[in-house]
UniProtKB/Swiss-Prot annotation:
Pathway noted in the entry: Cofactor biosynthesis; (R)-pantothenate biosynthesis; (R)-pantoate from 3-methyl-2-oxobutanoate: step 1/2
Species this protein is from: Prochlorococcus marinus subsp. pastoris (strain CCMP1986 / NIES-2087 / MED4)
Quaternary assembly: Homodecamer; pentamer of dimers.
Chief location bin: cytoplasm
SUPFAM superfamilies: Phosphoenolpyruvate/pyruvate domain
Swiss-Prot/TrEMBL catalytic activity: 3-methyl-2-oxobutanoate + (6R)-5,10-methylene-5,6,7,8-tetrahydrofolate + H2O = 2-dehydropantoate + (6S)-5,6,7,8-tetrahydrofolate
Physiological role: Catalyzes the reversible reaction in which hydroxymethyl group from 5,10-methylenetetrahydrofolate is transferred onto alpha-ketoisovalerate to form ketopantoate.
Pfam families xref list: Pantoate_transf
Record: residues binding Mg(2+): D42, D86, E118
Co-factor(s): Mg(2+)
Annotated Gene Ontology cellular component terms: cytoplasm
Gene Ontology BP annotations: pantothenate biosynthetic process
Taxonomy of the source species: Bacteria, Bacillati, Cyanobacteriota, Cyanophyceae, Synechococcales
Protein name per UniProt: 3-methyl-2-oxobutanoate hydroxymethyltransferase
């Protein structure tokens, strides 16, 4: 799967599904599920590294985990899910040259075929434009941007007229810059619908309603492995309880042997 193929999905009204992964096991599960995109998100900071936010995760962490995820893939490379790696905090906010260097390290040192960048402030737009000119495909991310939680909090964005219009403008700008898709996180459903209608590139929602061209979920949230669940992700199983009880049963049984 190449990034450019996702536009064809939108034209055919074919739903796009993305799952996150952080190691070879979760990568294998995500790929075998039939997900079109496997995202190595900086959410791994909380999912598997124990941090309280995405901010502490480093470029080295992202490269390490992206390589681990790719080793879980079993299909030929042209048949694999599209592997996308998040650019972590302060790898693209510190100037275009550094951003190109860091994104280049991701693409050169992993099997990722694209990077994801949060936000659309003028400086970020300059970085995105430069990366795309250098041949690095970019997925945008608007709405609730976790790397900006110190300013914005973990709350829904776009729910007043000013932020509503800003997110729409930013989405159009990212498309014009050449992003191949945009993640819309935790915004009102009708705003997501407006953006989906106006853009030619696909929108991939998380907590943005049913009108996006696709959906992305943190796999650990779907499997019920986290103590705290986001309000927009209902687990498909209570994984922490199920697996925890089974492990307790095994440990207790082994102690009796």
């Amino acid at each position: 799967m190449l990034p450019s193929e996702l536009v064809k999905y939108k034209k055919k009204s074919q739903k796009i599904i993305a799952l996150t992964a952080w190691d070879s096991i979760s990568g294998s599960l995500a790929e075998h599920s039939g997900a079109d995109i496997v995202l190595v998100g900086d959410s791994l900071a909380m999912v598997c590294l124990g941090y309280k936010s995405t901010l502490p995760v480093t470029l080295e962490n992202m490269i390490y985990h992206t390589n681990a995820v790719s080793r879980g893939f079993s299909k030929e490379i042209e048949e694999q899910s599209l592997l996308v790696c998040d650019m972590p905090f302060l790898t693209y906010q510190c100037g275009e040259n550094k951003a190109v260097e860091y994104a280049g390290k991701i693409i050169k040192n992993t099997y990722a075929k694209a990077v994801k960048v949060e936000g659309a402030d003028p400086e970020v737009q300059n970085v995105i434009s430069r990366l795309i000119r250098m041949g690095i495909p970019v997925m945008g991310h608007l709405g609730l941007t976790p790397q900006s939680y110190l300013n914005l909090g973990f709350k829904q964005q776009g729910n007043n007229s000013e932020s509503h219009e800003k997110i729409k403008r930013d989405a159009l700008s990212l498309e014009k810059l050449g992003c191949f898709s945009i993640v819309l996180e935790h915004i009102p459903e009708l705003l997501a619908k407006e953006i989906q209608t106006e853009l030619e590139i696909p929108t991939i929602g998380i907590g943005a309603g049913k009108f996006c061209d696709g959906q992305v979920r943190v796999t650990a949230d779907l499997l019920g492995l986290n103590d705290k669940q986001p309000p927009f992700c209902r687990p498909i199983i209570d994984g922490k309880k199920i697996f925890g009880e089974k492990l307790k049963e095994w440990v207790a049984a082994e102690k009796l042997n």
